[in-house]
UniProtKB/Swiss-Prot annotation:
Pfam families in the record: GTP-eEF1A_C, GTP_EFTU
Originating species: Laribacter hongkongensis (strain HLHK9)
Gene Ontology molecular-function annotations: ATP binding; GTP binding; GTPase activity; sulfate adenylyltransferase (ATP) activity
Encoding gene, per UniProt annotation: cysN
Cited function: With CysD forms the ATP sulfurylase (ATPS) that catalyzes the adenylation of sulfate producing adenosine 5'-phosphosulfate (APS) and diphosphate, the first enzymatic step in sulfur assimilation pathway. APS synthesis involves the formation of a high-energy phosphoric-sulfuric acid anhydride bond driven by GTP hydrolysis by CysN coupled to ATP hydrolysis by CysD.
Catalytic reaction annotation: sulfate + ATP + H(+) = adenosine 5'-phosphosulfate + diphosphate
Region (G3): 110-113
Top-level taxonomy: Bacteria, Pseudomonadati, Pseudomonadota, Betaproteobacteria, Neisseriales
Region feature G4, mapped onto this chain: 165-168
Identification of the protein by name: Sulfate adenylyltransferase subunit 1
Pathway: Sulfur metabolism; hydrogen sulfide biosynthesis; sulfite from sulfate: step 1/3
Length: 481
């Protein structure tokens, strides 16, 4: 089952070649405080024989000082690396770990369970394909269980494994497991998650983590590791149309001009006709360039450089799509599910930086439609947002950009709000829908709302540097008072 490292010592090149062809699964572990998330990851790594001898020796030494269990070795210390985490016996930051089996590679994000660190959990979930929701068998479904399940659903995670942990403390009682299973399924009816699996286990003792447990004969399903190894991800990509957000324009000399980025969705080949958004200009792909040479085809997840047949204006943040396929929306008014991540509350009407893929634009939240109570799934009236709160809002940006719905494509349907002074990340948004404002013709003459200091600076430039021939910003097309 688990990946053996003997090949690394014998033939590193053969190991790397085999490793590159494996499927990659990113998953998170989340749940309430002290449900055993870090212990579970430690057990996965330990029982998979993926801990080096020096790591195990270090954990044995640290266990004498920071042990939170009755065992000689506290496996949670493999993941809880911050001093504050070890002293308090909790997870604060998102900890990433890597391992593999014979068929699949894994990236684990161990997310904090405390409510004040929910923003950290949202960060870990933003790139995950699967979520392991841990539930303490003694307490059942808790508030944080609901909160994390809702965030996982909100962030588009399509697969959930509910791991009922600490079954050893309840004598591996089947009735307890079945009750928790039913409670969670009842709650999950309100969530957009269609693949939910359940497994009873003991992370501390190792039951049903890597190998099936002999102490739960009533459970005939796969172990947690077997589930992780077998879940299919090939149907998760909802969008098949080509999307390439431009991250960088590569111009090393006069003879080469390439547009670099990671393909967010779809497939591209030399000769394909493409459209650049939001400008709408068209051309054909001349070549797909990588560090390994030119490719005959490129697909989702590959970092490539496209060269085009025509010299057209393309900048960082523009999107290249394939002609004839469904197009993204080019809009400056978005309906967004927003997770607020800052101590200072959201202020409607205040200007923030909006970052989507490689694009940075000023924008503002103009309305809060409702706040979501993650415990009851009910919508509540709200005019602002506090730390860790989630709401549906209207976000207006100062120029149109090409976007997709988050459910269709994560990379082109997600954004963050950034403070324009401190550059602190304030919130994470998932685009639900988009609509263009009236009068938009192109990005350059899109409606703008100039700030007072920008207009004042423009006046100073025109007064003291008339030879620069600067135009009055208030006369620019689309200016709004």
């Amino acid at each position: 089952m688990t990946h053996q490292s003997d090949l690394i010592a014998e033939d590193i090149h053969a190991y790397l070649a085999r490793h590159e062809t494996k499927d990659l699964l990113r998953f998170i572990t989340c749940g309430s405080v002290d449900d055993g998330k870090s212990t579970l990851i430690g057990r996965l790594l330990h029982d998979s024989r993926l801990i080096f001898e020096d790591q195990l020796a270090a954990i044995e030494r640290d266990s004498q000082k920071h042990n939170t269990t009755d065992e000689a070795v506290d496996l949670a210390l493999l993941v809880d690396g911050l001093q504050a985490e070890r002293e308090q016996g909790i997870t604060i930051d998102v900890a990433y770990r890597y391992f593999s089996t014979d068929t699949r590679k894994f990236i684990i994000a161990d997310c904090p369970g405390h409510e004040q660190y929910t923003r950290n959990m949202a960060t870990g979930a933003s790139t995950a394909d699967l979520a392991i929701i841990l539930i303490d068998a003694r307490y059942g479904v808790q508030t944080q269980t609901r909160r994390h399940s809702f965030i996982a659903s909100l962030l588009g995670i399509r697969h959930v494994i509910v791991a009922v942990n600490k079954m050893d403390l309840l004598e591996f009682d089947q009735a307890v497991f079945e009750r928790i299973r039913q409670d969670y399924l009842t709650f999950a009816k309100a969530l957009d998650i269609h693949d939910i699996r359940f497994v009873p286990l003991s992370a501390l003792r190792g039951d049903n983590v890597v190998s099936p447990s002999e102490r739960m004969p009533w459970y005939d399903g796969p172990s947690l590791m077997q589930l992780l190894d077998s879940i299919r991800l090939d149907a998760d990509q909802a969008l098949q149309a080509f999307r390439l957000p431009v991250q960088y324009v590569n111009r090393p000399n006069l003879d080469f001009r390439g547009f670099c980025g990671t393909i967010a969705a779809g497939v591209i080949r030399p000769g394909d006709q493409v459209t650049v958004l939001p400008s709408g200009r068209q051309s054909r792909v001349r070549a797909i360039v990588t560090t390994d040479g030119e490719l005959p085809v490129a697909a989702t997840g590959q970092a490539v450089t496209l060269t085009l047949e025509d010299e057209i204006d393309i900048s960082r943040g523009d999107m290249i799509v394939r002609h004839g396929e469904p197009l993204p929306l080019v809009a400056d008014r978005l309906t967004v599910e927003l997770v607020w991540m800052h101590d200072a509350p959201l202020q409607t009407g205040r200007a923030y930086w909006v970052k989507l893929a490689g694009k940075w634009l000023p924008g503002r939240v103009t309305a809060v439609h409702h706040r979501v109570n993650v415990n009851t799934m009910e919508r509540e009236a709200a005019s602002s947002l506090a730390l860790n709160e989630i709401a549906e809002v209207t976000l207006e940006i100062d120029a149109p950009m090409a976007v997709d719905a988050y459910r269709q494509c994560r990379a082109t349907g997600s954004l963050i709000l950034v403070d324009r002074i401190s550059n602190a990340t304030l919130g994470a948004g998932m685009i639900r829908s988009a609509e263009p404002s009236a009068g938009i013709q192109s990005e350059k003459d899109a409606a703008r709302r100039w700030q007072a200091f920008e207009i004042e600076f423009n006046e100073l430039v025109r007064r003291h540097f008339p030879h620069w021939q600067a135009r009055d910003m208030r006369d620019w097309p689309g200016h709004k008072e």
